[in-house]
Amino acid sequence: MFKLIVRKNDSGLTGEATASGRRVLLDHLEACAARYGFEVDWYEPGESGYIKRNGKFVGTWEVSKL
């Protein structure tokens, strides 16, 4: 099992999701981000990165093994 944690920079809000595979979480993250006008940047491929909107960094994300 894997866990995705997404954090919003300016408010401390977080969101979490779990799935049996890392790729499932990454696909979900990218699809949801695109749907709402966000971009997903990779810091460490498949592990962590940043979320941008209109060129500004607005959050971070990470995937870890449970």
Curated annotation (Swiss-Prot):
This is Gene 84 protein. Pfam families: Phage_Gp84 (PF23794). The lineage of its organism: Viruses, Duplodnaviria, Heunggongvirae, Uroviricota, Caudoviricetes.
